Structure formats: structure tokens, C-alpha cells
């Protein structure tokens, strides 16, 4: 390979200066540990009187201007005497072609300085490389061919490429080693403190300021070849971070560090005028989240120049999700923050609206977080490796809190996005919990620790993997701004359908898409009209922080919400333990039923969020077990506690609506409890209708044979489902669960065929009448047509009918699996309450600790800025290479498993006997031939139709209220005046519309 020519004099290795007045510990910030970056000039050439004159700090440059006079030659070595080396050939001509006959140049730098002509300065100060086309920012070595996959970032907005005068020749430059290494953080010369203008790859210019006037063809290229290195070689440019012990002062007895950000990240930041942009703040929290404020911990938003009011506090919880899921959510959040800042006419938001928004990322367990997710956080500047400690003065650290205001974002393709793509600064808090303590504990850190320190107005909860729409968070916040009675709100959760809807080819994804759509069209609008939404999904929901607070006695929504975290073992009965699997349902109930208040919950249709739904059977069953058990027991809890509504400050009309909703929920609860028997009986009567020889479409009694086979298959399959659910995990019996769902699909297909055949035969029969009454036409055709027809009508009413054509068939085929597989597995595993804390109470020591006496401690930290840069470079390289992470082994069984299993047995036996008695009794009373005279079938079908009509009425009311609100708000905004020719009649109409709008809002 071609090697570059060597410099004409030995390199100079200088030590960085730490005498910056802002970097030394002060009384206000005694624990500040700030490492010198290459952007802080440690040399001053104004005086040569003393050796220390060169160590005086210079004002930090705020432009990124390559040098036009500084050479690549380094100053004299720190050695007393330079090594004696032969001078280079005087015939050397820069920028000339190399030839084999040219004289060989020495390998080491010469002790003499040879004067060479300088090439003309380049008009382009930056490579024309798109920062967004690479998963990592570039380094200056890419100009020299050192790493072609690392392009330079675009020029910052404040740079001036045209400024090439000598007055600014040494502004923001740094020397680059020309040995092909990727390590761009070389020693600084006496003429520059940052990056130089790259020259020809095969040349090394001296300090001459002459322009290039020789003929380039006279240049002779010299080839250098050396021996191949022996043994395994590390990656070129990779430098292992070096740690050294430092003494720092504690703040209020706690470890708080201000650490400079990596050099590469600093190089393309548009804003560098505040510490929040140039330094990452680390706090080692050694207390419980409830004592965070009392112990004197602070966040940047409550100290110094960054003291601000927080209007919106966003929580993103994660466990072990990879970098793709994290960046999908984080980039969407940053685009939403940009939307807040784009609302220039808003009284709350505007250009600096980002200062009122704080994003808190909470990871559940330091050993559980995905390593690539940590790399993504490091790329954004909010995380640095080697800073955290396990204990401070023998006190165990409970959480590691990193704070930084980032100006870059990573999209789902791991491409950098900055101000050129509309990204605005974002205040980040990254809380890395030391132990794995479940999502509920993460919310306790969010509400009781950080929320108490910031006192926000609205809190938004997001799960990693959920991608909110570009303006969804604004609409969610607006619901609280327009109605002071709203305590909680949620948006529409959509299933992620993939590119061109490719994910819908999976029947499991398509069925969930249909289920989500029906819930967002029928259930959520109905509950929003009543004012009580049974569950605000944690994937995309918001709460008013003031409404969540407990009363003076300590009782309130948050106390009940976090009660589930303190329940352990036999001290918590199975009912309470399962109820707190859906703690978000308990929080919704406690808000609406809060004593002396009139809080309501609202559904915001314009707020949407996409989430990836399970696409495999084991993950799907495990997810629904928690949902179904939590929903069932939480519904029972709210129905038992219905008297709490009387102690609220709701109006009489609102209380009546809430009690109507309780009746509706009670009916739904009964149908859920007996859903297994209802499915079997529906199959028994509908499919059994083809056993009649006069109705049999196949003839020769084939319909009776098929029904008998499917009937026994269904009974055996249900029994097998109990055995599977009691003894096997879904992950350990994938094929059995998949086979059972396929067989249920076959049974549902035959039942649907029988139903359609009976309907067609009834409609085409000449002797049949279509009168409404106790007959097949009324009981079967009208009831089923009304149910399915309402689905179509309401979907078209909301202008979202596509799921009826793309996902309805898959949903109806998998409907028996929803009932039999999911319900059976959920009830058979009521003992499985995942606490997530077994074996995680050992204090780790892998990070080291901060040990000392008094207010000063000693700890290991990166030695210099180069070590911070090395960690950042490694994180970017990991993201670029997409390094795989080995999976973790399966965890052990949870504590108190034997106790919960004993209670589970009684629960399952009672439920199975109740459904069995109902199924056997009805099947014995009614034959399988008289569908028109079957009272039970008629009751089931009409009950389903009635519930659908009730949901449709609520959904229609919701739509009407929205239309009226839009009309009223439009009239106010446009300031429409009633024409004078309408006289007093027009003013009466205007007053009537306003009163109707205000009454509907209340």
C-alpha cells in the first residue's frame, strides 16, 4: 500500500491545559470535572516570554474553519535533543506523480525543516457528504482515506467557509496524523487547536505560506513498503479508553459530575453557548425514588441558568428492547417536539417551546438493557461509558441519572438527523436503574422522583416501540389545555402494518389490527362519552400531574397505583395480585372516583400511535394472559367499589352516566366469564342445524357425520387446552398451541358456512315469509346482519373502513382461539404474577465506587478527552456494524409459585364446572334442529346485537359532540358575526349554539 510522506520534523506532544476558569472547581460547582476538548485552545501565541505563556487558555472558537497557514509539521519534541536523521532529498516536489526511479525518503521525521510550496486553499471547507447517509458522524481522517465510511458532517449554520485570511488561519484546527490511522485526535501543534484543512494524501506540507507554482508533473512519487506486522492486530484507529483516579468533591454528600461531550459530537452542534449542550451531567442516586427531592437531588431544569418551568414531561419506559425499537420511538418524539416549536402563534409554545418539554427515558435494570440501545443513547450524547459507579461512600447506587440537551436524533434506520431536518434541542433525562424492578417501579421514579422535582403540568407515558404521529403529542396535550376537568387522555393505538401492509399477510397481525380498530371505533368513544375510560393504554396516554396527587392523608390515585409494587408473596391475595397486573386500569378508576373531585377521562381521536403487535403465537398468548387477567380482576374491583362515585363532586347527570356504564360493564363481564360455553353452544346449534336431512347440503347424511366429528374434536380440543395451559409455557409448546388455533379455525369455518347456508336457504325459499317474529329469519338473519352491519356502518362513519376488507376474515376465523386458547390460558395461569425481583438484590461492584472522607471522594474516570472520544467512536461503530447481542438465558420460576398454584386449582375448577353445567343443561333442553324455536340461541344473538347497538349509540354521540365542538370553536376563531337582516333571531341562534357547546363540554 502507498504510505504518506513523513513530516519534515519530529512531532510535538503537548499536555492539555486545565487552567480554564470555567473548568476548575468552584464553590458553586465543586464537583465539576471537565476534560479539555480539542476545541479549547490551550496555547496562546501572543507572548513568547516564558514557557508557561503557551499554556494560557484561549477563548473557545465558535466556528469550524480549516486552517490555511498551519502546516502539518509538528513542533519540536518534548525530548531535549531531536534524534539525528538524514535530511530528505532536495528534489522533492509536492503534488507530482510518483515513479519507481525516485529516491527513497527516510521513514522517520527529519531534524531539519525543508521549505516546500504550499497548495492553494480549498474553497470547500467540508466534504460534500450527507451526514444522514451514514449511521455515524464523520471524522477528519475521512479526508485522507483513513475511513471512507465516516464522512464529515455538513458545515454548522454559524460557519463561514469563505473566511481564509491569516487572521483566522489557526481558528478551530487540529493536527491529523497521516499514518492511515482512524485516530483523529492527535497531538496539537503550536499553531492550531483544532482540525486543519486536509491536503493531498501523498504530501506533507511545511509551514511555508507560498502558493503552489511548480509544475505538478515534476513531482516524483516515492513508494514505501515495510514488513507485515506479526500476530493479531487490533482495528486501526481504535484506542482502548484509559482510566485514571481523580478526586472530586461531593455536592450535598452526593456524586454529581459534569462531563464534556465527545469531540466528534461537539464538532457538528449548531448551539454551543450553554453547558447543557457541551456537558453531560451524571448523578449517582443512592436513595429511594420517594426520597429523591428530600435528599437534595436536583435536575438541570431547577438549577442555575437552565432553570425552567416544565409544561410537558414525557416518560419512555424500556426493558431489553433493541436500538431499532428505541430509535423508532425517540425520533418520533423529537419530531413532535419540533411540531410544538413550529406553532409560532401559540401562547404556550413557539420557537423556544423545547425548553418546556423534558423527555425522561427509564430503563428497567442495568444488566437488562440492550447494549445497542446504550450505543444509540451514547451517540445522542446522553450516555458515556465509564462514568457510573456502584456505590458512593459505601451507599449502594439505586439509579444512574444522565442529563443532556441533545441536538441530534437517530431515526429507525440509524441515520443522524439534525437541525437541517428540523430537529430542535431536546432536554433528555436517562435513568438507568441498577436493578430490574418492573415497569411499575419505573413509573414511581418518573412520578415521585423526577415529577416531584420538575412539577410538570401534563405527563405523557410511552412504551419503547410505539411511534406517535408527527403531531399526536400536541393533540394529546391540547385535550388538557381546552378542558380543565380532564385528568387523563389517550390516543388511538394502531397496529404496525409494515410496508404496503405486508404485515397483514400474517393472520395474527391482521386479527389484532381488526380488534384494535373496533376498540377505537366502538369502545373508546362510548367510554369517553360517559367520562370513564376503563383503561388508558400505557403505550400512549397522558395524565394531569395535579390530578394524580394524593390528598393530605396520603390516599389518592398514585398511592393506589403504586400499591401493587409493595405486594409480595402470601401477603397479597391472588385477586389483588392479578388486579395489579393491569395497574393502569386501577389508576383510571381512582382518578374518576377521587373524593371531592370531578375528573373525567377523554379519548383523543386525532392522537395516533403505531406499535408492533406480536406476530408469533407464544408472544401473543403471553401478552394476552396479563391483559385478560388484569382486565377481569380490575373490572370486578371497579364494580365492587362503585359507591365511591357518590363521594365525588361529579354532577348528577355525570353520575347517572357512570352508573349506566357500570351496568354495561357488568353485562360485558358476564359474557366474558361464560364466553367458553357460549362459543360451544353457538357452534352446537348453528353447525348442528345441518344434521337435518331436509337441510343437509351434502346429502346422504354427510352433514350429520361432519358435525359429529367436529363436535367431539371441539370438546377434546377444549380439554387439551386446559392441560396445555396448566402444564406448558407457550414458548415450550409452540407447535401444540399453533395446531390448536388451526383446528379452531377449521371449526369456525364450518360454523360460518352453516350459518351462511341457512341464511341463503331461508332467503331463497318460496314458502318462507320474512315477517319479524319468532322464526329463523328474525333470530338468525336479522341479529347477525345487524351485528356485522353495524361494524361496517360505524367504520364508514369514521372514514376508516379498510380493516373490514383486509382483516375481518382473519379476525372471525381466529375468534374461537381468542375465546378458548387465550381465556383458558389466562385463567389457568392466575398464579403467574411476575414480580421481576427474584435474585436481583445483590449489590454489583463491576463499575467501582466513589470512596473518600468528608466531601471529597476518589474515583476512576476517563483520563482525558481522548478516552471519552474513544468510547463514543466505539458506540458509533457498533451501531454501524449492527453487532449482534447474544440472548439471555431463561429466568427461573418466580417466588411463591406453590402458593399461587394451589389457589389456581380452585379458580380453574370453579370456572370449568360453571361453563360445563351451562353447556350441558342448554344442550339437553334444546335439540339441534329447531333453530327458530331455540330461546337460548335467540337470547345470545339478540344480546350481542343489543350490545353492538349500544356501543354504536355511544360512538355516534361522541362523533356528534366533536362536530358541535368544531362548529363552536370555528365560530369563535373566525369571529363570525350574524348578519344584520336576521335581527334578534340571529343572536338567539348564536346564544343557543354557545350554550349547547358549553353544556356538552361540561
From Swiss-Prot:
Disruption phenotype: Leads to increased germination. GO terms for biological process: chitin biosynthetic process; mitotic actomyosin contractile ring contraction. It is a multi-pass membrane protein. It comes from the Eukaryota. GO terms for molecular function: chitin synthase activity. Its EC number is 2.4.1.16. The chain crosses the membrane at residues 627-647, 669-689, 704-724, 740-760, 780-800, 808-828, 906-926, 940-960. Residues 63-78 have a biased composition (Low complexity). GO terms for cellular component: cell septum; cellular bud neck; plasma membrane. The keyword ATP-binding does not apply. Residues 1-165, 178-209 are annotated as: Disordered. Polymerizes chitin, a structural polymer of the cell wall and septum, by transferring the sugar moiety of UDP-GlcNAc to the non-reducing end of the growing chitin polymer. Contributes to the production of conidia and the ability of fungal conidia to germinate. Involved in fungal stress tolerances. Belongs to the chitin synthase family. Class II subfamily. This is Chitin synthase II. It comes from Metarhizium acridum (strain CQMa 102). The lineage of its organism: Eukaryota, Fungi, Dikarya, Ascomycota, Pezizomycotina. The gene is ChsII.
Amino acid at each position: 500500500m502507498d504510505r504518506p510522506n513523513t513530516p519534515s520534523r519530529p512531532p510535538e506532544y503537548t499536555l492539555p491545559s486545565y487552567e480554564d476558569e470555567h473548568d476548575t472547581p468552584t464553590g458553586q460547582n465543586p464537583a465539576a470535572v471537565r476534560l479539555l476538548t480539542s476545541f479549547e485552545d490551550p496555547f496562546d501565541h501572543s507572548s513568547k516570554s516564558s514557557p508557561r505563556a503557551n499554556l494560557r487558555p484561549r477563548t473557545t472558537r465558535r466556528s469550524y474553519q480549516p486552517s490555511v497557514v498551519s502546516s502539518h509539521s509538528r513542533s519540536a519534541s518534548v525530548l531535549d535533543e531531536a534524534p539525528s536523521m538524514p535530511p530528505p532529498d532536495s528534489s522533492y516536489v509536492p503534488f507530482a506523480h510518483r515513479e519507481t526511479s525516485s529516491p527513497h525518503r527516510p521513514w522517520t521525521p527529519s531534524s531539519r525543516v525543508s521549505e516546500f510550496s504550499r497548495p492553494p486553499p480549498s474553497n470547500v471547507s467540508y466534504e460534500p457528504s450527507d451526514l444522514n447517509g451514514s449511521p455515524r458522524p464523520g471524522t477528519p481522517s475521512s479526508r485522507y482515506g483513513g475511513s471512507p465510511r465516516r464522512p464529515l458532517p455538513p458545515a454548522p449554520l454559524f460557519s463561514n467557509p469563505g473566511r481564509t485570511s491569516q487572521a483566522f488561519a489557526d481558528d478551530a484546527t487540529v493536527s491529523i496524523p497521516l499514518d492511515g490511522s482512524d485516530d483523529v485526535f492527535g497531538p496539537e501543534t503550536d499553531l492550531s487547536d483544532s482540525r486543519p484543512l486536509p491536503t493531498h494524501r501523498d504530501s506533507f506540507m511545511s509551514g511555508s505560506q507560498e502558493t503552489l507554482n511548480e509544475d505538478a508533473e515534476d513531482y516524483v512519487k516515492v513508494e514505501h513498503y515495510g514488513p507485515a506486522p506479526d500476530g493479531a492486530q487490533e482495528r486501526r484507529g481504535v484506542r482502548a479508553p484509559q482510566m485514571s483516579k481523580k478526586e472530586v468533591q461531593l455536592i450535598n454528600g452526593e456524586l454529581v459530575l459534569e462531563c464534556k461531550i465527545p469531540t466528534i459530537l461537539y464538532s457538528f452542534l449548531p448551539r454551543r453557548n450553554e453547558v447543557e449542550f457541551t456537558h453531560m451531567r451524571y448523578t449517582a442516586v443512592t436513595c429511594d425514588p420517594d426520597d429523591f427531592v428530600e435528599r437534595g437531588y436536583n435536575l438541570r431544569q431547577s438549577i442555575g441558568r437552565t432553570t425552567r418551568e416544565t409544561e410537558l414531561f414525557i416518560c419512555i419506559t424500556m426493558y431489553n428492547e433493541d436500538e431499532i425499537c428505541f430509535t423508532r420511538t425517540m425520533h418520533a418524539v423529537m419530531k413532535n417536539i419540533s411540531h410544538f416549536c413550529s406553532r409560532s402563534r401559540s401562547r404556550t409554545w413557539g420557537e423556544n417551546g423545547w425548553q418546556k418539554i423534558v423527555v425522561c427515558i427509564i430503563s428497567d435494570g442495568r444488566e437488562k438493557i440492550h447494549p445497542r440501545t446504550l450505543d444509540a443513547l451514547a451517540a445522542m450524547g446522553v450516555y458515556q461509558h465509564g462514568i457510573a459507579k456502584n456505590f458512593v461512600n459505601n451507599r449502594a447506587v439505586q439509579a444512574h441519572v444522565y442529563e443532556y440537551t441533545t441536538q441530534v436524533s437517530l431515526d429507525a434506520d440509524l441515520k443522524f438527523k439534525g437541525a437541517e431536518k428540523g430537529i430542535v434541542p431536546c432536554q433528555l433525562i436517562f435513568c438507568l436503574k441498577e436493578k430490574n424492578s418492573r415497569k411499575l417501579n419505573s413509573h414511581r421514579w418518573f412520578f415521585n422522583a423526577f415529577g416531584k422535582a420538575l412539577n410538570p403540568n401534563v405527563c405523557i407515558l410511552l412504551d419503547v416501540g410505539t411511534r406517535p404521529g408527527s403531531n399526536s403529542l400536541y393533540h394529546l396535550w391540547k385535550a388538557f389545555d381546552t378542558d380543565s376537568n380532564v385528568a387523563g387522555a389517550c390516543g388511538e393505538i394502531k397496529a404496525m402494518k409494515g410496508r404496503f401492509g405486508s404485515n397483514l399477510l400474517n393472520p395474527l397481525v391482521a386479527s389484532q389490527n381488526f380488534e384494535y380498530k373496533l376498540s377505537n371505533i366502538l369502545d373508546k368513544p362510548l367510554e369517553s362519552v360517559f367520562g370513564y375510560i376503563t383503561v388508558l393504554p400505557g403505550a400512549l396516554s397522558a395524565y394531569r400531574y395535579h390530578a394524580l396527587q394524593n390528598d393530605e392523608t396520603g390516599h389518592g390515585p398514585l398511592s393506589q397505583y403504586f400499591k401493587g409494587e409493595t405486594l409480595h408473596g402470601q401477603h397479597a391475595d391472588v385477586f389483588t395480585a392479578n388486579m395489579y397486573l393491569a395497574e393502569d386500569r386501577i389508576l383510571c378508576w381512582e382518578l374518576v372516583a377521587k373524593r371531592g373531585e370531578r375528573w373525567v377521562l377523554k379519548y383523543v381521536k386525532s392522537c395516533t400511535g403505531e406499535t408492533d403487535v406480536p406476530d408469533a403465537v407464544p408472544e401473543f398468548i403471553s401478552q394476552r394472559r396479563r391483559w385478560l387477567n388484569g382486565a377481569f380482576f380490575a373490572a370486578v374491583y371497579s364494580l365492587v367499589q362503585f359507591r365511591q362515585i357518590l363521594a365525588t363532586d361529579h354532577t348528577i347527570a355525570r353520575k347517572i352516566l357512570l352508573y349506566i356504564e357500570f351496568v354495561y360493564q357488568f353485562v360485558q363481564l358476564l359474557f366474558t366469564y361464560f364466553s367458553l360455553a357460549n362459543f360451544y353452544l353457538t357452534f352446537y346449534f348453528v353447525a348442528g342445524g345441518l344434521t337435518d336431512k331436509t337441510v343437509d347440503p351434502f346429502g346422504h347424511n354427510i352433514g350429520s357425520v361432519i358435525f359429529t366429528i367436529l363436535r367431539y374434536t371441539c370438546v377434546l380440543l377444549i380439554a387439551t387446552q386446559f392441560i396445555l395451559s396448566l402444564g406448558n409455557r407457550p414458548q415450550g409448546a409452540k407447535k401444540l398451541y399453533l395446531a390448536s388455533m388451526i383446528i379452531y379455525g377449521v371449526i369456525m369455518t364450518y360454523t360460518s358456512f352453516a350459518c351462511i347456508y341457512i341464511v341463503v336457504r331461508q332467503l331463497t325459499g318460496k314458502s318462507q315469509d320474512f315477517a319479524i317474529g319468532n322464526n329463523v329469519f328474525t333470530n338468525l338473519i336479522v341479529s347477525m346482519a345487524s351485528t356485522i352491519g353495524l361494524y361496517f356502518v360505524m367504520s364508514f362513519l369514521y372514514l376508516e373502513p379498510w380493516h373490514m376488507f383486509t382483516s375481518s376474515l382473519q379476525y372471525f376465523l381466529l375468534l374461537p382461539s381468542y375465546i378458548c386458547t387465550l381465556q383458558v390460558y389466562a385463567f389457568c395461569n392466575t398464579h403467574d404474577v411476575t414480580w421481576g425481583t427474584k435474585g436481583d438484590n445483590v449489590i454489583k461492584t463491576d463499575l467501582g465506587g466513589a470512596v473518600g472522607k468528608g466531601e471529597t471522594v476518589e474515583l476512576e474516570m476517563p483520563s482525558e478527552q481522548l478516552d471519552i472520544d474513544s468510547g463514543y467512536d466505539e458506540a458509533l461503530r457498533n451501531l454501524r456494524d449492527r453487532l449482534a447481542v447474544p440472548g439471555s438465558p431463561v429466568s427461573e420460576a418466580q417466588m411463591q409459585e406453590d402458593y399461587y398454584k394451589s389457589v389456581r386449582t380452585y379458580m380453574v375448577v370453579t370456572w370449568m364446572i360453571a361453563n360445563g353445567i351451562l353447556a350441558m343443561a342448554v344442550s339437553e333442553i334444546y335439540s339441534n334442529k329447531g333453530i327458530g324455536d331455540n330461546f337460548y340461541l335467540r337470547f345470545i344473538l339478540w344480546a350481542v346485537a343489543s350490545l353492538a347497538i349500544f356501543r354504536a349509540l355511544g360512538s355516534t354521540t361522541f362523533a356528534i359532540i366533536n362536530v358541535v365542538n368544531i362548529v363552536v370553536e370555528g365560530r369563535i376563531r373566525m369571529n363570525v358575526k350574524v348578519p344584520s337582516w336576521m335581527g334578534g333571531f340571529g343572536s338567539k341562534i348564536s346564544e343557543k349554539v354557545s350554550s349547547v357547546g358549553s353544556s356538552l363540554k361540561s
